[in-house]
Amino acid sequence: MGMSQNNSTLVAPQPKGIIDPATGKPVGSNDAYFTEINDELADKGFLVTSTDELITWARTGSLMWMQFGLACCAVEGLMQASGPRYDMERFGVAPRASPRQSDVMIVAGTLTNKMAPALRKVYDQMPEPRYVISMGSCANGGGYYHYSYAVVRGCDRVVPVDIYVPGCPPTAEALLYGVLLLQKKIRRTGTIER
């Protein structure tokens, strides 16, 4: 039963996986019964997909951001991007006040040596998966104050940064583009680990 005898050696049948390596689709997906069920569900508003794709889709469409505003970029760039003209919420990105409810931290402004431990503490309070957008020249590399003794030359020395948004101050379009790139990165990686 299921075993074949070949030169006095018992050989088990080749195990079948869930995904067919030739097509990349689930085994049996070309079955007429499966196709019929899929066609019946298509016109009723149902979607047949994998759990991983569903979780990734939900994660990209419901990012909650908080700002770590240190200087002018926090006021100028984020307020403009959140206003009615650009409206970041239509892209599935909504503001939150607490790091424990946030997925994305937007660091905007000059990070000083005194504020670096606070930035790390806030970052550590965020739940996994967490992402960081560095916004503006000062957060990216120190900006005008790069050679000051009191300035950290980029917030990536304190927390891992996923997206860099250049500019002094960056435009609202640049910030929105950074958010869209982050959503694309989440869709591409699809896992909690970076």
Swiss-Prot record:
> Which parts of the sequence are annotated with region: Disordered?
1-22
One GO BP annotation of this record: aerobic respiration
| Its EC number(s) | 7.1.1.-
State a GO cellular component annotated for this protein. Answer: respiratory chain complex I
Reactions the enzyme catalyzes: a quinone + NADH + 5 H(+)(in) = a quinol + NAD(+) + 4 H(+)(out)
Query: Locations of Polar residues compositional bias?
Result: 1-11
Indicate where this protein is primarily found. membrane
Matching entries from SUPFAM superfamilies are given as: HydA/Nqo6-like (SSF56770)
| Keywords, ordered alphabetically | 4Fe-4S, Cell inner membrane, Cell membrane, Iron, Iron-sulfur, Membrane, Metal-binding, NAD, Quinone, Translocase, Transport, Ubiquinone
Membrane topology qualifier: Peripheral membrane protein
InterPro entries named among the record's database cross-references: NADH_UbQ_OxRdtase-like_20kDa (IPR006137), NADH_UQ_OxRdtase_20Kd_su (IPR006138)
For this chain's record, the cofactor binding note is: Binds 1 [4Fe-4S] cluster.
What NCBIfam families would the database entry show?
nuoB_fam, PRK06411.1
Protein family according to the UniProt entry: Belongs to the complex I 20 kDa subunit family.
What do we know about how this protein assembles, alone or with others?
NDH-1 is composed of 14 different subunits. Subunits NuoB, C, D, E, F, and G constitute the peripheral sector of the complex.
Summary of the function given for this chain in its UniProt record: NDH-1 shuttles electrons from NADH, via FMN and iron-sulfur (Fe-S) centers, to quinones in the respiratory chain. The immediate electron acceptor for the enzyme in this species is believed to be ubiquinone. Couples the redox reaction to proton translocation (for every two electrons transferred, four hydrogen ions are translocated across the cytoplasmic membrane), and thus conserves the redox energy in a proton gradient.
- Protein name in the entry: NADH-quinone oxidoreductase subunit B
Q: Which organism is it from?
A: Agrobacterium fabrum (strain C58 / ATCC 33970)
